Regions:
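Membrane-interface helix termini and inter-helical loops of multi-pass transporters
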Residues: 118-121, 273-277, 357-362
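Membrane-interfacial, low-structure loops and terminal tails that flank and connect transmembrane helices
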Residues: 1, 158-163, 309-328, 479-505
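Generic start-of-chain signal for non-secretory N-termini
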Residues: 1-11
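Hydrophobic cores of alpha-helical transmembrane segments in multi-pass integral membrane proteins
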Residues: 9-41, 47-84, 88-116, 129-153, ...
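Short His/Asp/Glu-rich catalytic/ion-coordination signatures at enzyme active sites or charged loops
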Residues: 124-127
Length: 542
């Protein structure tokens, strides 16, 4: 690995953390509004409404923070795993500037209240054309990352024809292969429907076709967020905790299943949409339950790996190994606590996928609570844990304060234990999501008793974030000690040689993924494309 990979990781992670800061601040505004604190009049004209705040929060956290962090961290891991530089430094820098340019272009209308369409940007809500083109450029940048990773791997393979691809590199390639396939839906929505519509080249669009193309990408993007966290959980955390990965072949199998199953499941977000046959909705429901299986493999494999670490540190009982983990290491503590809360988020996701039970929670605050257990904890807290070693390494300076880091990690865990279950309960009591709750005329008594807890949980999360950013800034600007060594990759109890050779072949898995997508999406997309008139005009509500 050269300084180029480190600099590319540094600039991408920097943009990601700046975006996270903006998303956290706007998240506090929404939590306070839930608690009955009228804050938006004091923020005008910077933040003009609840929906302006939600749009900024969603785009910065769910799209910008995650994408830039992943595009910094995953190539870093692949390069380090292969012990080889990226194939093209120029391509790496071109990628960053394409993405950064797209971010600036999209941010101008977003901040200016000309793209208050939330991070799903469903039509007929209409944003400024710069918002759509900017986000499209960010997606194009991720494709360039995929190209660089593949070129790097092929160069490594030419030098090592008989070696099994190292696990971290294998997972990095699967992550971006899955995302490149899945992002084609979003690209089609942007290029065919939204950009021409926003530029005035066509008079209308269609909400159902746009939503279907969005969810072609919109659910797989969850795995684009999660799989980099899994890379750390599988390849680094067992070693950081003092143990070994339980099974390398099982880890590879889980990622292959994610590659095959992550995309043909998006219609489970559209159970209530007319115009899609119930049979296709049922197929997507079954496939959504199927994609839960590789997460179960991950749960078993990572838990077994942590148990080996706890027992290596002296534990003897069935449960006591958990207490023997190195809880004084903020990187480990953050990621293990992220795993704990994600277990509940994963199980809760089965309710969203269920063909009938989904009707109880659909478009309620339950979904907000679920999303904050997945991206808000499993992803965000894991990425925070990663930065506790990655930022010191990139800056060449030791983490400023492990104590502050540990306090931050536990505050995030505690705040989310208040914030997310309360939103789940509010959803079960019928409170809608994506609604300006502070100004509704139909407030229910059973909601009023719980809403202050959302504000309390959100305030604790914000305090945790303040400590996190303070620690990051002081690490870069003030710390003078040398950093700790970068965590080594974990050895495996059952190593890569125990996996069949065909696991390392790409064509069968990519072909199977394409066939399954064609079956699950082909008939619906073809029918909608042929029969749907593009007549829906644009609306700007806020």
């Amino acid at each position: 690995m050269t300084r180029v990979e480190q600099r590319l990781a540094a600039v991408n992670v920097t943009v990601a953390l700046v975006a996270l800061f903006g998303g956290v601040v706007t998240g506090l505004f929404q939590a306070l509004e839930y608690a009955g604190v009228e804050i938006y009049p004091a923020l005008a004209p910077i933040v003009r409404s609840h929906y302006h705040s939600v749009s900024i929060h969603g785009v910065l956290n769910a799209l910008v923070f995650t994408t830039f962090f992943i595009c910094g961290f995953v190539p870093f891991m692949l390069s380090r795993s292969l012990q080889a530089p990226l194939a093209s430094a120029r391509l790496g820098w071109l990628t960053f500037w394409v993405m950064a340019g797209g971010l600036v272009l999209a941010s101008i209308p977003l901040v200016g209240n000309a793209a208050t369409v939330m991070f799903t940007f469903y039509p007929p809500l209409k944003a400024h054309w710069a918002f759509y083109i900017g986000l499209t450029l960010v997606v194009v940048g991720t494709w360039l990352v995929t190209l660089n990773l593949v070129l790097t791997w092929r160069a490594w393979r030419a030098r090592n024809p008989d070696r099994r691809t190292p696990l971290a590199a294998f997972m990095a390639l699967v992550t971006f292969a899955m995302w490149t396939i899945a992002s084609l839906g979003l690209a089609a929505e942007m290029l065919v429907l939204l950009i021409p519509w926003s530029l005035g080249l066509v008079s209308g669009t269609d909400a159902l076709l746009a939503r279907t193309l969005f969810w072609f990408t919109g659910h797989p993007i969850v795995y684009f967020w999660l799989l980099p966290a899994y890379i750390s959980w599988y390849t680094l955390v067992p070693r950081q905790a003092g143990g070994k990965l339980f099974s390398d072949p099982m880890a590879r199998t889980s990622f292959i299943l994610f590659l095959i199953l992550s995309t043909p499941i998006g219609i489970h977000h559209q159970y209530t949409d007319p115009g899609i046959h119930q049979g296709w909705k049922l197929l997507h429901a079954l496939l959504t339950f199927a994609v839960f299986f590789p997460s179960l493999l991950t749960f078993f494999n990572v838990t077994a790996s942590l148990e080996t670490a706890g027992r290596a540190r002296g534990a003897r009982g069935w449960i006591s190994w958990f207490g023997k983990l190195p809880w004084t290491d903020p990187s480990v503590a953050a990621q293990v606590l992220a795993m704990v809360l994600f277990a509940f988020g994963g199980v809760g996701g089965l309710i969203n996928a269920s063909f009938n039970v989904n009707m109880v929670v659909h478009n309620t605050a339950y979904i907000v609570g679920h999303l904050h257990l997945t991206i808000g904890t499993a992803v965000t807290l894991t990425f925070m844990g990663i930065t506790y070693w990655l930022v010191p390494h990139l800056a060449g300076r030791a983490l400023f304060s492990r104590t502050i880091a540990l306090v931050q990690v536990w505050l995030w865990f505690g705040g989310m234990l208040i914030f997310s279950p309360t939103l789940h309960e509010l959803g079960l009591r019928g409170m809608p999501r994506r609604t300006d709750i502070g100004h509704i005329s139909y407030m229910q008594p059973q909601w009023k008793t719980l809403l202050p807890l959302v504000g309390i949980g959100g305030a604790i999360l914000f305090l945790s974030a303040v400590l996190y950013f303070l620690n990051m800034v002081l690490t870069v600007a003030v710390s003078r000690r040398a950093p700790q060594p970068v965590p080594e990759f974990a050895e495996a109890v059952s190593g890569p040689d125990h996996a069949p050779a065909f696991v390392d072949r790409w064509k069968p898995w990519l072909a199977l993924a394409a066939i399954l997508i064609a079956i699950a999406y082909g008939p619906t997309l073809i029918r909608l494309a042929i029969t749907t008139p593009l007549t829906t005009p644009g609306l700007r509500v806020w």
